[in-house]
C-alpha cells in the first residue's frame, strides 16, 4: 500500500489539487519517483532469488542429518510472496482509480511497459550496466587477459573483510580483487580456472560470497547474495556461497593428482609488508600452504600489475573525475590558509568539497604541512598553528570509484611569497616543466625525466645555507604511477601509452624552515603527455592572486 500511495501521489496532486484531469497523459509523472520503482523491481528480483535459494536448500537437506540451520529458510520466500501479493493488490487498486480518468489504451500501454521492464531488473537495481562506474564487460575482459597468461595453475584470491577497517570503518575491497571482479561484498573469495589446467574442466570463473543474512543487513545494508542473483548482478559465470570455497578448492586440486599429473600451481596475491602487520593475505597464504602443501604457490601480482598499469577509457574517466574533485578542494583550502589558523582547519576546508562532489574518501592521508612541517615528506599530523610568513605544503587528493589523484601545491600563509620563497618556488616549477618537455613518446622513462628536472636545479645559481646546489635538497623520486593506489603498481622501465603518473619535484630546506613541492598528474598518449590537473594553477603569481582574492578586504578608514 505504501508503494501504491507513493506512485499515486503525483497523479492525485495533479487531478485534485490542480484540477488537471488529463494528468495521466503527462509522461514525466511516471518518473517522479524512479528510486521507488527500482526498489519495487529489486524486491521482485530478491523474491525470485529467495525461491531459487530455497529450492537449493531443500535439495541439500535430503543429504543432511542436521536440519537446524535450515528451519527458517522456507519462511523467506513465503514472506516475500505475501509482500508481492500486497504489492499486486495495491497496484490493482491504483489501476482501478486511474481507469476512471484514463482510456483503456493508455492503461494497457502502461501494463506492457511494466512487463517488459521488470525482467531487466539487474541493470535497474545496479543503476546501469556498470559496477563502480566500470562496465561489467570490462571486468570480464580483464579476467580473460589474466587467464590467457596462466597455463599451469589456477587463480585463488581472498577479498577484504569488514573487520579489516575496524569496528565501524568504511569497507573498501582489495584492489586486485576489485580490478578483476567489481565485487564489493566483504569476505569474498575467487577461483579462476584457465581452460585445460584441470582435467575435464573448461575455463571457469567463480566468486564466493557470504549467503544473505537479513539480520546482518539490518546493521550494514543490503548485500547481493550468491546464486542467480549474484551472477546477474556481477556478470559472473558463477557466484557461490563462501562456505563452499574450501571444498571446491580441494576438489579442483585433487583432480590432477588422481590422474597422476603434477600438482597444480596456485596463483595468488602474496602478502606485502606493512609495518609488521599480519595481513589477511598472510593468513590466507598460510592456510593454502597448510591445506595444500604439495601445490606450489606463485605470486600473481606480477601478472596483474602490467594489466593495471595501462588504463582503459573508463579508468581514465575515473582518474580525471578524481583529479577534478581534488582541485575543488585545493581551491577551497586557499581561503582557509591564513596566519592563526590550524593545519587541521585547512584540512577540513580541503576535504569537504570532495565529499560533496561524490568522493568516497581521501586517496591517502592529507598532508597539510606549514613551516618546518613542509620539509617532512609524509607529514600528516596536521595539528600545528599556521604562522605569518610561512609556506604550507598541501599534498592531498580525493579517491573516486577506487581511483585516486595525487596533487601537491605550496601556498604562502600570508598570501604572498617572500623573495627567497618565490625564487625557490620558481626553481621547482621550472624543474617540473623541464621534466614535461623531456618526455619523448615511446622512448622516455621516469628516470629520464628525473635527470632533466635535477639538471635544472643543479645549474641554478641558488644555494642552500651550506653553499650546496639545490638539487641536493631534492631528496625523493620525481614521480610514480597512480590508479587504484596512490603509488600504483607497475614497472618504471618505460612510460607506456595509457599509463598515468605524477611529476613532483621538491626542494626542502629545514635550516630555512620551509619546503616547496609541486605535483601534477599526467596521462601518457602516443602524441605526448596530457596534464590531467592543468586546471589547478601553479604559477606563483596566480597562486597569490587566488589566495588574496578569497580573503576579506581590509576595513576602510
Over which residues does each language-model region extend?
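Active-site neighborhoods and metal-handling regions in enzymes and metal-associated proteins
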Residues: 56, 65-67, 99-108, 123-557
Amino acid at each position: 500500500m505504501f508503494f501504491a500511495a507513493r506512485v499515486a501521489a503525483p497523479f492525485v496532486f495533479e487531478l485534485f489539487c490542480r484540477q488537471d484531469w488529463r494528468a495521466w497523459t503527462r509522461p514525466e509523472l511516471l518518473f517522479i519517483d524512479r528510486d521507488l520503482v527500482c526498489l519495487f523491481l529489486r524486491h521482485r528480483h530478491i523474491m525470485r532469488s529467495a525461491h531459487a535459494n530455497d529450492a537449493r536448500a531443500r535439495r541439500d537437506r535430503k543429504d543432511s542429518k542436521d536440519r537446524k540451520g535450515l528451519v527458517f529458510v522456507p519462511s523467506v520466500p513465503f514472506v516475500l510472496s505475501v509482500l508481492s501479493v500486497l504489492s499486486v493488490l495495491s497496484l490493482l487498486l491504483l489501476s482501478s482509480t486511474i481507469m476512471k480518468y484514463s482510456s483503456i489504451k493508455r492503461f494497457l500501454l502502461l501494463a506492457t511497459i511494466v512487463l517488459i521492464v521488470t525482467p531487466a531488473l539487474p541493470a535497474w537495481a545496479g543503476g546501469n550496466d556498470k559496477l563502480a562506474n566500470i562496465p561489467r564487460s570490462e571486468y570480464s575482459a580483464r579476467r580473460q587477459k589474466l587467464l590467457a597468461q596462466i597455463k599451469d595453475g589456477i587463480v585463488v584470491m581472498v577479498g577484504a573483510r569488514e573487520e579489516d577497517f575496524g569496528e565501524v570503518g568504511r569497507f573498501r575491497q582489495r584492489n586486485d580483487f576489485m580490478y578483476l571482479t567489481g565485487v564489493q561484498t566483504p569476505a569474498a573469495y575467487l577461483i579462476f580456472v584457465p581452460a585445460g589446467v584441470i582435467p575435464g574442466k573448461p575455463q571457469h570463473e567463480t566468486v564466493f560470497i557470504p549467503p544473505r543474512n537479513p539480520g546482518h543487513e539490518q546493521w550494514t545494508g543490503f548485500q547481493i547474495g550468491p546464486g542467480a542473483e549474484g551472477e546477474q548482478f556481477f556478470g559472473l559465470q558463477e557466484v557461490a556461497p563462501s562456505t563452499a570455497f574450501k571444498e571446491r578448492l580441494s576438489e579442483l586440486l585433487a583432480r590432477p593428482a588422481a590422474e597422476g599429473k603434477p600438482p597444480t600451481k596456485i596463483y595468488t596475491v602474496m602478502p606485502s609488508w606493512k609495518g609488521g602487520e599480519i595481513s589477511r593475505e598472510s593468513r590466507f597464504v598460510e592456510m593454502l600452504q597448510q591445506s595444500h602443501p604439495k601445490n606450489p604457490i606463485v605470486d600473481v601480482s606480477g601478472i596483474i600489475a602490467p594489466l593495471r598499469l595501462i588504463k582503459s577509457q573508463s579508468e581514465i574517466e575515473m582518474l580525471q573525475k578524481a583529479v577534478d574533485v581534488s582541485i575543488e578542494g585545493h581551491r577551497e583550502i586557499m581561503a582557509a590558509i591564513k596566519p592563526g589558523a590550524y593545519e587541521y582547519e585547512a584540512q577540513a576546508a580541503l576535504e569537504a568539497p570532495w565529499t560533496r562532489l561524490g568522493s568516497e574518501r581521501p586517496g591517502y592521508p592529507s598532508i597539510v604541512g606549514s613551516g618546518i612541517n613542509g620539509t617532512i615528506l609524509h607529514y600528516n599530523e596536521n595539528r600545528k598553528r599556521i604562522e605569518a610568513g610561512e609556506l604550507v605544503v598541501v599534498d592531498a587528493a580525493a579517491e573516486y570509484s577506487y581511483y585516486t589523484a595525487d596533487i601537491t601545491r605550496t601556498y604562502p600563509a600570508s598570501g604572498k611569497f617572500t623573495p627567497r620563497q618565490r625564487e625557490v618556488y620558481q626553481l621547482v616549477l621550472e624543474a617540473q616543466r623541464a621534466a614535461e618537455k623531456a618526455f619523448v613518446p615511446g622512448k622516455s622513462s621516469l628516470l629520464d625525466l628525473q635527470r632533466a628536472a635535477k639538471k635544472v636545479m643543479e645549474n641554478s645559481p641558488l644555494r642552500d645555507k651550506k653553499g650546496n646546489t639545490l638539487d641536493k635538497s631534492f631528496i625523493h623520486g620525481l614521480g610514480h604511477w597512480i590508479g587504484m593506489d596512490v603509488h600504483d603498481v607497475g614497472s618504471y622501465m618505460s612510460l607506456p601509452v595509457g599509463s598515468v603518473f605524477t611529476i613532483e619535484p621538491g626542494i626542502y630546506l629545514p635550516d630555512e624552515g620551509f619546503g616547496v613541492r609541486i605535483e601534477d598528474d599526467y596521462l601518457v598518449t602516443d602524441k605526448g603527455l596530457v596534464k590531467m590537473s592543468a586546471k589547478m594553477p601553479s604559477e606563483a603569481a596566480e597562486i597569490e592572486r587566488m589566495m588574496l582574492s578569497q580573503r576579506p578586504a581590509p576595513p576602510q578608514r
